[in-house]
Swiss-Prot record:
InterPro entries the record matches: GIY-YIG_endonuc (IPR000305), GIY-YIG_endonuc_sf (IPR035901), GIY-YIG_UvrC_Cho (IPR047296), Hlx-hairpin-Hlx_DNA-bd_motif (IPR003583), RuvA_2-like (IPR010994), UVR_dom (IPR001943), UVR_dom_sf (IPR036876), UvrABC_protein_C (IPR050066)
Its biological purpose: The UvrABC repair system catalyzes the recognition and processing of DNA lesions. UvrC both incises the 5' and 3' sides of the lesion. The N-terminal half is responsible for the 3' incision and the C-terminal half is responsible for the 5' incision.
Oligomer status and interactors: Interacts with UvrB in an incision complex.
Keyword Cytoplasm part of the UniProt annotation: yes
HAMAP family: UvrC
Top-level taxon of the source organism: Bacteria
GO biological process entries: nucleotide-excision repair; SOS response
Cellular component aspect of the GO annotation: cytoplasm; excinuclease repair complex
Protein's name according to its UniProt entry: UvrABC system protein C
Species annotation: Coxiella burnetii (strain CbuG_Q212)
Gene3D superfamilies referenced in this protein's UniProt entry, alphabetically: 5' to 3' exonuclease, C-terminal subdomain (1.10.150.20), GIY-YIG endonuclease (3.40.1440.10), UVR domain (4.10.860.10), UvrC, RNAse H endonuclease domain (3.30.420.340)
Alphabetical list of Pfam families matching this protein: GIY-YIG, HHH_5, UVR, UvrC_RNaseH, UvrC_RNaseH_dom
Compartments reported by the entry: Cytoplasm
Molecular-function annotations in GO: DNA binding; excinuclease ABC activity
Length: 609
């Protein structure tokens, strides 16, 4: 509804709970808010005394839409949904585009597998986490394997083993695949690992001590020594780890402000053990208070579908939280247990709140320093290449193939804060003569910029091509055909001897090459962007080539059809294991003669590499 007459408009608003959307002259949502009393809350925006941020926002507001909800909890949930949908410029916007990783234990299997997992929790079993990042998961996975020796391999690999793999040799698995440990013994390993995950290290140590004593009494000294080493590792770990004094799952949220920017840091406490922390730097309108930022951050973070509904038993904030009970009730509404949110600085959380705030301040300081550094480097590129306008966004393309096989093009994107990985794209090239880099580049650029013209992204200020004037000409022709304007076209070509630091730069529309000094910061950033595009292209190409070679292996051997090929791969647990096998081992596969085994062996080694 438009607000030509605010007084009359406000009288039409309901007094119940709901959500309001503020829109500008183009109908774009620029702010979303929740309210216990819509009329009272929206009326507050029409007072004479408003802070500078709210004044700037209200100067753009042309209409306000309201949505009535059944209760306050529903209003908070709907607000979070609208913020995610509309991304309003005056809201605090959380940029969190990756789902959270877990450790997954497939307890339904006869010999449960422990592995890294990311995504929706659909498979049966136990999920431990979420962890702040993949590094934390892998670190804990390595620790669990060292302590409890649980298998990590896939089911097909596990079921078709005829000998232990490397994990057994380095003492990271007990090789249940070949019967070196029975189901009962392996289940005991699994139970110990679960107790460890639950923070019950003392119980694990008691059980291991009992087993050590039994083994010693039975004169099985090697087994007793194994339990002794496990106990020592666990006790050493207990001393190294920071323990909260509790056994539950807690998130400690720290917040800090610097030069108008706001940063968060969450300490993840799981089963009384800190497993890591993660910083966040949401888009925050100038003038946003810490309390406002905290109120908007928490629902967005915990209601994100990327979290799979994982909310700990307790959330502790380093600053006072307005509407604390309201947020607590709303977040609890979808849970079958209690949730507590604490903002008071008292034992046992006081030291954790201080630590979280310190982590937030340090992470924000580093983030702003990196942002300023990148902004200076982008400014240096503009000056060094004598470009007419400031640079906020650069895209770089590279082509990768092996003698024309499995050609892939990469597109990487850099902005004022560094690489924007969520905007990276890769293009599998098809219908182009093998080895035709120009044709591959034209196809990738056409696909990319058709989508950008259709609104599926943001046009860059600068398009950088890994190549020379020939590649640059292809880019210019594509953009001209698509009638894309306002993008500066540049290229970086290898110099004499392909030595780093001797590269040549080109700008479309200029005849002369540009040579920048090797210590020029603009040159360093251009090299960094080019190298990132190259890395991304190489990775995608290698994956595509490997997939093709797996598909082509065995296809030309007489007597090997799709079913037998699949049977072979399943028997050995994959192509790599088949390639490692001898002729005698291949001949043990049911239905494979020695002659056929030799043909398979020869074909595998022809495709290997």
């Amino acid at each position: 509804m438009t607000i030509d007459n605010p007084s009359a408009f406000l009288k039409t608003l309901p007094t119940g709970s709901g959500v309001y959307q503020m829109q500008d002259a183009q109908g774009k949502v620029i702010y979303v808010g929740k309210a216990r009393n819509l009329q009272k809350r929206v009326s507050s925006y029409f007072r004479r005394q408003l802070d500078s941020k709210t004044q700037a926002m209200m100067a753009q507001v042309q209409s306000i839409q309201t949505t009535i909800t059944r209760n306050e909890n529903e209003a908070l949930l709907l607000e979070a949904s609208f913020i995610k949908q509309f991304r309003p410029r005056y809201n605090v916007l959380l940029r969190d585009d990756k789902s959270y990783p877990y450790l997954y234990l497939a307890t339904h299997q006869k010999f449960p597998r422990l592995d890294f997992y990311r995504g929706a929790k659909k498979a049966p079993g136990r999920y431990f986490g979420p962890y702040p990042n993949a590094g934390s998961v892998r670190e804990n996975l390595a620790l669990i394997q060292k302590l409890f020796k649980l298998r990590q391999c896939s089911e097909s690999f596990f079921k078709n083993r005829t000998r232990p793999c490397l994990q057994y040799q380095i003492k990271r698995c007990t090789a249940p695949c070949v019967g070196y440990v029975n189901e009962q013994e392996y289940r005991r390993q699994v139970e110990d690992a679960i107790l460890f995950f639950e923070g019950k290290n003392d119980q694990v140590i008691i059980k291991l001590t009992e087993r050590m004593e039994v083994a010693s009494e039975n004169l099985v000294f090697e087994e007793a020594a194994h339990y002794r080493d496990q106990i020592r590792q666990l006790r050493r770990l207990q001393k190294q780890q920071i323990i909260t004094g509790g056994k539950g799952n807690i998130d400690i949220i720290g917040i800090a402000e610097s030069n108008g920017a706001i940063g968060f840091a969450i300490l993840f406490i799981r089963s009384g053990r800190m497993i890591g922390h993660k910083p966040f730097f949401p888009n925050t309108p100038l003038g946003t208070t810490l309390q406002t930022a905290l109120v908007e951050f928490i629902p967005q973070y915990y209601l994100s579908p990327l979290r799979n509904g994982d909310i700990p038993e307790r959330i502790v904030t380093s600053e006072p939280l307005e509407d604390r009970l309201w947020i607590q009730r709303a977040l609890s509404s979808g849970l079958n247990r209690k949730l507590a949110i604490t903002d008071q600085k008292r034992a046992p959380y006081k030291q954790w709140q201080a630590m979280a705030a310190l982590n937030a301040a340090q992470a924000l300081s580093q983030h702003l320093a990196q942002k300023n550094t990148f902004a200076l480097k982008l400014e240096a590129i503009q000056k060094s290449l004598a470009l007419p306008n400031p640079i906020a966004r650069i895209e770089c393309f590279d082509i990768s193939h092996t003698l024309g096989e499995a050609t892939v093009a990469s597109c990487v994107v850099f902005g004022e804060e560094g690489p924007i990985k969520k905007d990276y794209r890769r293009f599998n090239i098809s219908g182009v003569t093998p080895g035709d880099d120009y044709g591959a580049l034209r196809q990738a650029l056409t696909r990319r910029y058709v989508r950008l013209k259709e609104g599926e992204g943001i046009l860059p200020d600068v398009l950088l091509i890994d190549g020379g004037m020939g590649q640059l000409r292809q880019a210019a022709e594509v953009l001209e055909e698509l009638q894309v304007s306002g993008v500066i076209l540049t290229a970086i070509a290898k110099g004499p001897g392909r030595k780093a630091g001797l590269e040549k730069l080109f700008v479309w529309g200029r005849r002369e090459e540009i040579h920048l000094p090797a210590d020029n910061i603009a040159f360093h950033l251009i090299q960094q962007i080019r190298d990132e595009a190259h890395r991304f292209a190489i990775t995608a190409h290698c994956n595509r080539r490997a997939k093709r070679r797996v598909e082509s292996t065995l296809q030309e051997i007489e007597g090997i059809g799709p079913k037998r090929r699949q049977k072979l791969l399943k028997y050995f647990g994959g192509l790599q294991e088949l390639q490692r096998a001898s002729i005698e081992e291949i001949a043990r596969v049911p239905g494979v003669s020695e002659t056929l085994a030799k043909a398979i062996y020869d074909d595998c080694h022809q495709h290997k590499g």
